[in-house]
Amino acid sequence: MAKTRFIQSSFVSGELSPLLKGRIDINQYYQAVETAENVVIVPQGGMRRRPGTEFITECVKGISKKSPTYTMPNGGTSSVLNDGDDTTSTSTTTPIGTTDPYVVAKMDLLVDLPMKFIDLRQISLSTGTSSQFKVQYSTDDVTYADAASVPLLGTNPQNFRLLVDHTARYWRLARIGATDLGAATVTIAGLSLYEESAILSTPRLVDMSVEDDRHYLVEFTRDNIAIFRSQLVGINIQTTRVADIKPLYSGLTSAEIENIRVAQVENVMLIVGDFAPMRLVNLGTDSDWFLDLIPFTNVPQYDFDDALSPIPVDEIQVMTLGHTGSGQWKRGDRFEIDVEGVLSKSISFAGDSTPDEQASTVFNIQKNLQEMPVFGETGVAVTRTGTKQYTITISGESTKDFELFSAYVTEGSTDHEIDFTKTQSGSPRKEDVWSSTRGYPNSICFYEGRLVIGGTESKTQSIFMSKTGSFFDFDIDDGDDDEAIFATISSRKLNDIVDVYPGRNLQIFTSGAEFAVTSKPTTPSSITIQPQTSHGANKVEVQDVDGSTIFVDRHGKSLLSFLYSFNEDAYTSDDRSVLASHLINQPVDMALLAGTASDDANWLFIVNTDGTATILNTLRSQDINGFTSWKTDGDVKSVCVVDDQLFMTVERTVNSVKKLFIERWDFTYLMDCSIKSVQVAGVIDGLDHLDGESVKVLTRDGQADANEGYVLSSYTVASGEITLDPSEVYSFTTYEVGLPFVPTIKPMPLNTNIGSGQNQMRLKKIVRMNLRVYESSGIHIDGIAVPVREFGEAGTTSPLTGGSIIPKTGIIEDVYDINGWGREVIPTITCPDPTPMHIQMIEYEVEGN
């Protein structure tokens, strides 16, 4: 029997589609695998265990406002506290002084109920400041405990949403403390309690960076906006909930939440979606935020001319041609009309004596007015209503409430006068392009000092750009270079805008094609929107990856790279996922982790509609482009990168109940949804999120090497904690507790040359196999544990002894007789326990038939 050797030292092409099993003619076949599950590609060529995830928090479900009985023992009108109207407020009448407790308002729910939030609306002090106000709860109206502290109050009204998360019947807002506040009283417009409902909606995660060391994760849910700060504390990343905000929308569905888009400049985030556009501002500290509607001015107008359009009212102005001296109007005299700063062409007076002269003068006035850019294509009518008197009626698409017209003579006697009077003010049929009637913007970004809005619900193919340097002003009247722009894509097919991206040009992704604004600079008179490619994109927000813009095609089946080509002098779109198309399944979200402090890879995390995830490892300069799959005990729903930390939301079934968690990708975690904690008297708590679930336990970061990296027994969480077996209790040791996952690598079917040709489809046998590994332990081949021969001084450890499970770098040597004879005898490499795994190279000795 002929024997050959085959070495695979690169895995940078990742997992290949089953459709490529026969493509032994391409280089990618020999640097790829058939299965790459729960692993990631290392840019240097190997594959390693994917990161685990740290549990951050459970996502907020829907919330509903309660209607307790209110009392205000220190004066005030309690009926306004839950009316939902921030414009009506009430004030206490008793001075605060040194009263402790000073109860502003008390709420009685009649029975004990679990409350999630309390809203304080437009609360202020009449004088002074205080940080001693608390929200408290009680089950008996006698003994109260703190549920939340109110941030510093002053004389300016403020809004707060506080997380209370307690079950009680009685709740109160009170000053707790003895600081003398003198004659100060409290004014408040709203005090509302909210209970969490069972409505589960996928949140939208976005990042917001205010300074180099201040990075926030913003979570949008159906009734809440939660803000978390991610920061390095010591050697660990710490993610802390710092604020909750009542949004200016309510009751969003999962689909509506998914459509949220944001753009950020300095400490301001602009938010658009299926609601009135909002502005979120950080005021300097983690807990100090302000949310309001974006203060747009001069919103672009459009005449939709349908059943929803306003009924227009005609504008009527009367023009009279007169004179002050002896100079009479003569045929051939000329004049121009000024309409709100815009001049008409020169109008010729044709006389006013005969019917023909009168008709000709009327025609000249009407024609030149209609051609003015301030009017539409139709709607200007002129009639002669007296001697040298002409009534101008503006109707239909042209009407609005105009300023009084004016005019001046360009040719004729200096005695001529032209007077105007307004007899009726008009109102237009045109209306704001975005509004509660017409819907709101779909996408948003900044480009060349302008705010760009890509499509609205009613103008899906239009681009709107603000005035230069004035992001909220969309004044387009004069068409000056710095004024706003309103442009519409015109092509042979429907091109609804789904995203806009500010690259080397403004890139516009639509449902039918990809476009770019190629004019430099972009002005109202020069804007050019040119088609580039015609794939079409779905609604997933595009990502800038390694110098190209990655988007998902409109069918949700491929990942495309939008990249400028100097040879074409245009953008081209290449299919990045053609070799792993089976891993792209209607993506709903994606985010780029562009290298970290410990890794130089670019990982694009793609969330599929079926709850699986796909990771693209890419480094264009090194021709690295490989996909691996991510599977967990649950469904991944959304993803976001904050600075160099990747967060995801995962829907898990815990004790038969569906829950949504925010989790953080971290290579120092070896399990999913896990926590790191210490044991106290053999008990590890903080596991409420996994109550009723079976979890694995791993020792981590022990002060003695003997306590590091042991995989302990499985336990079932009860009442948010587990009790360790006495034999598994270690002092000075951190434990990781979470849900296990299994990394799996299965190489492509072997193809070697045995002299008579390629043998991929022939019977063969792997008689020996060696693996080079890095910092690994607990590796199994076809379900059988194999030892690592560690590099080091001779005789320090036996290569055949399990011994310590501290990760080792070395060779798994002389694995014999893999799977017997067959055509596809490739082994499966796994790591069933939560231990490190990093494969660098595989060597086969193959015997062929």
Predicted segments with their positions:
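Hydrophobic or amphipathic alpha-helical targeting/insertion segments
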Residues: P247, T253-D305
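Surface-exposed interaction regions enriched in Ser/Thr/Asp/Glu
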Residues: G426-V433, V717-Q758, C831-E847
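Short beta-strand-plus-loop segments that form exposed binding edges in beta-rich domains
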Residues: A174-G182, I829-D833
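Beta-sheet-dominated scaffold domains
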Residues: R450, S491-K696, D701
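Acidic, small/polar residue-enriched beta-strand/turn segments
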Residues: T383-P428
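Extended, beta-strand-rich, solvent-exposed assembly scaffolds of outer structural proteins
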Residues: P101-K106, L110-A148, N156-D165, Y170-W171, ...
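N-terminal beta-propeller domains
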Residues: M1-Y70, S79, D85, S197-T240, ...
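Disordered, acidic Ser/Thr/Pro-rich linker "stalks" and the adjacent N-terminal cap
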Residues: V42, E54-F55, C59-L110, S124-G128, ...
